[in-house]
């Protein structure tokens, strides 16, 4: 718990140093390193930590406290976006640097920084009151940046463990550093295949335009 108490910024530097790019198998060691780092921090906080296997990257499912207490569920993800294009970075994307009071590195904001904030806050709560009456389920996945393909199945299998009175999602944003917001909803992803059928042969727009329905018009409708 000491690094979360003594130097949350250093904890974030360490977390960022793992290149946990889920979309590229060449970063597999970085993904596992970030996962192990998060598990270690949660164990330091007194959580019981389980790794739930998935076809791609395991999900961290950690719990702490008496199940009869009010229940809080916290969500985050340990994977990050690829750092490309590298020539737009002025420093190593996985070697976080501080400039003008901000820490720059891939994943510092999305989503490792918010997790360290939550863990550091919990470390202070548990230091002052080890038996704080709150049951916490901490969920950290490793596939968010590739669309969370394993997440729906995980939710179905573990929905009883994920019951809570409050859900805290550490993957939102703010209009500015001096503006605190409460985000109550997020857009999801939707993948679909659309088939549009038109004339069986090419037709010149200068001759047939307007007289026949253009497939592009149907697509726009």
Predicted segments with their positions:
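Fold-level recognition of mixed alpha/beta catalytic cores in primary-metabolism enzymes, strongest
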Residues: 100-103, 108-221
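Acidic/His- and Gly-rich active-site-bordering loop/insert found
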Residues: 1-108, 125-134
């Amino acid at each position: 718990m000491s690094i979360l108490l003594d130097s949350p910024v250093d904890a974030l530097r360490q977390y960022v140093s793992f290149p946990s790019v889920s979309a590229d198998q060449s970063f597999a060691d970085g993904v596992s390193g970030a996962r192990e780092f998060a598990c270690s921090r949660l164990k330091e906080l007194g959580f019981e930590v389980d790794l739930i296997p998935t076809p791609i990257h395991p999900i961290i499912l950690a719990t702490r406290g008496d199940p009869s207490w009010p229940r809080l569920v916290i969500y985050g993800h340990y994977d990050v976006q690829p750092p490309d294009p590298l020539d737009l970075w002025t420093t190593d994307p996985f070697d976080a640097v501080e400039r003008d009071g901000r820490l720059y590195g891939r994943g510092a904001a999305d989503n490792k920084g918010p997790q360290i904030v939550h863990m550091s806050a919990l470390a202070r709560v548990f230091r002052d009151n080890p038996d704080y009456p709150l049951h916490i389920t901490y969920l950290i996945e490793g596939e968010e940046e590739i669309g969370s393909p394993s997440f729906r199945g995980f939710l179905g299998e573990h929905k009883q463990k994920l019951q809570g009175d409050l859900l805290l999602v550490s993957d939102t944003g703010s209009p500015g550093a001096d503006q605190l917001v409460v985000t109550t909803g997020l857009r999801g992803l939707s993948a679909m295949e659309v088939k549009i059928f038109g004339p069986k042969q090419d037709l010149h727009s200068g001759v047939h335009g307007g007289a026949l329905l253009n497939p592009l018009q149907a697509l726009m409708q």
